[in-house]
Amino acid sequence: MSTNEGSLWGGRFAGGPSDALAALSKSTHFDWVLAPYDLTASRAHTMVLFRAGLLTEEQRDGLLAGLDSLAQDVADGSFGPLVTDEDVHAALERGLIDRVGPDLGGRLRAGRSRNDQVAALFRMWLRDAVRRVATGVLDVVGALAEQAAAHPSAIMPGKTHLQSAQPILLAHHLLAHAHPLLRDLDRIVDFDKRAAVSPYGSGALAGSSLGLDPDAIAADLGFSAAADNSVDATAARDFAAEAAFVFAMIAVDLSRLAEDIIVWSSTEFGYVTLHDSWSTGSSIMPQKKNPDIAELARGKSGRLIGNLAGLLATLKAQPLAYNRDLQEDKEPVFDSVAQLELLLPAMAGLVASLTFNVQRMAELAPAGYTLATDLAEWLVRQGVPFRSAHEAAGAAVRAAEQRGVGLQELTDDELAAISPELTPQVREVLTIEGSVSARDCRGGTAPGRVAEQLNAIGEAAERLRRQLVR
């Protein structure tokens, strides 16, 4: 049997936990990242205890000095958890007591439970983590916008069902990947409204009888408010699930971008050439240049979806208030952040380094009769009902297929035979440039509209960058 050395509980137990229980309970291998936040919160808690008359000035100053010394040692790596420490809180209490003695060091726990403590620290860590992730997302948005700005007139085949559909601007397609990422950033900004509520002062679940001031410590720690319900404050992890969803959504959005890059870089498509610094080779095939970054992005999205699903499954049947199940809440979130911090710089660099083969894209843009919709809409503008126009455009496609030519290569007589309304003037829209320019509506692919969109994305990114600073 082990003793309860390194734990924050004891007294009513005649002995320590079994070795198996101690090993199962141990969390310093992942929760040590909370140490700086724990020390910051302990400084604030010291001041709350002092203002409540529970510490003298001398005791306050002694605790603060001990915490400052411990923080320095944690920062430079000279202090860390021991194998006997159950968690980050126990390790830091041991470090504080080593510096100020058990009488003074033991006073810091008054009015504070690990239940409200860890809930607060998790929120503090996560509020910082989402900002780091957001910076990486902004870098990907910036890379997409820069590539769009560099190719204002390049035309490519737009696709639905991975089949050629209509010509669009390459810039329009690239910005279609930027918009979801901007929405993810909006979610991060909105998330902070709910994450910025402090559980401190809630104790184990019922609050404190020591006259502490939850609002004061909330303000000291940068929270916007103290929790309204102590039971909810210690038990709630919806903020963690919300963050895990945003992280998973970012990964899914990156995965869709990655899929385009993978397909576009294939020999069959040939839309992009990968830069040597952002691709890998084969151990046996000398000619290969593989889109590993994009493939890892696609793979990691499943990992982050799994982290979200696992966290929700952990939360789904817990009675109020705190349960030890919640030790399992942090690793999925920590992992999602770690994966995004690896992935986002790589994706930003990959996008920025792509070389677009604009001539090939332009050559392929009319393939697959992508101008058929333009023909039908031209007829509509001449007063033909759309049902009839659709039929005529389909007949024109069939005629072109039979001859093995493009729509623009049908003769005037062939067009007139399909529909008398198909006069030679229809050729004005049977070019990829004419098709793109005609879609001059809000959100459309016309060059002027895409330029407006590019400006709006730049403004939105700058607004979000300002909102994420605190």
From Swiss-Prot:
The protein's Enzyme Commission number: 4.3.2.1
One GO biological process term: arginine biosynthetic process via ornithine
Record-annotated disulphide pairs: none
Pathway: Amino-acid biosynthesis; L-arginine biosynthesis; L-arginine from L-ornithine and carbamoyl phosphate: step 3/3
Top-level EC class as recorded in UniProt: lyase
Record's subcellular location: Cytoplasm
Protein name: Argininosuccinate lyase
Superkingdom as given in the UniProt entry: Bacteria
Reaction equation(s) it catalyzes: 2-(N(omega)-L-arginino)succinate = fumarate + L-arginine
One matching Pfam family: Lyase_1
Membership in a protein family: Belongs to the lyase 1 family. Argininosuccinate lyase subfamily.
GO cellular component: cytosol; peptidoglycan-based cell wall
GO molecular function: argininosuccinate lyase activity
Record key words, sorted: Amino-acid biosynthesis, Arginine biosynthesis, Cytoplasm, Lyase
